[in-house]
Amino acid sequence: MYTDEADEERTLKAAAYLTPEMWQFYGEARPKKPGGQLRISEKDEDGERKTRRVEDGCIFLNRKGYEAEGFTGTFGCVLHHVAQRDGKHFADTKPDVCWQLPLRRSFETREYGEREYSVTVIGEYERLAWGDGGDDFDWYCTSNSDAHVGTEPVYVSNKYELELLMGKEAYAELARLCDVRMQHIRDSAARNLPLFIIQHPATLAAQKK
């Protein structure tokens, strides 16, 4: 589902750079009339606009094992592939709901006395966030230990995405606090104080593999 019109427009703009050589469903997306708009979007059961579903999957997903004359693309999201081809960040070509993973941005209303505040919360996408069926999404879920193998902390490797979600000023403060936290972990490990090292359960599971 698109976040807003700007999200859909960005995706549409990126799709215009795709070629039949790299995109399995290039033909499916062609406009019905010359000069018309690419047919990459549709409405869901709630009337919200989203990327089209073709053959039980996203129109931008090149299926594994697909072969055709002239097709030189690879399995996976073709919007991600075009970002790599053109030297862009995938957050500039993919819909918000796709590039934000494994980060999760939610909005809450909190009451303090007689006042209400809108709060933006940046967290992780774990299985529980999906509700029913969440266990089926472990392939990109932070609850899966297979995802905890990066050489950098998420706040470093996902700097660009976090800056888009929360702004550069807020990110700078986040990075400062996380730097302090990471140094504390290193100091505690050097002093052999494991009880003072609090890490993500999936990270600990990954370290034991």
Features from the language model and the residues they span:
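Short loop/turn segments that flank or connect secondary-structure elements
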Residues: 1-209
